[in-house]
A protein has these predicted regions:
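Compact, glycine-rich, soluble single-domain proteins
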Residues: 1-75
């Protein structure tokens, strides 16, 4: 499952960042790397971007970018 697939109020652990180059580095710099716990806070009114919380930091990502972050959902 990717961050783009998750709904507000759901959470999980980042398993993999599958983007390459600048995009992958940008996601890692925002704190999205394997092992990090993330929580989907909300979607914007039009559904894009999505706001997430990663280790106490709030980040807004376009769904296009969120597709590159693979997450293991918390059950």
């Amino acid at each position: 499952m990717t961050l783009a697939d998750m709904r507000p109020g759901t959470s999980g652990t980042v398993e993999r960042v599958s983007g390459r180059g600048i995009l992958a580095q940008r996601l890692i710099d925002m704190g999205l790397y394997p092992g990090v716990f993330v929580n989907v806070v909300r979607n914007s009114p039009l559904g894009d971007p999505v706001e997430i919380e990663a280790e106490g930091t709030f980040v807004a990502l376009r769904r296009e970018e969120a597709r590159f972050v693979e997450v293991s959902p918390q059950r």
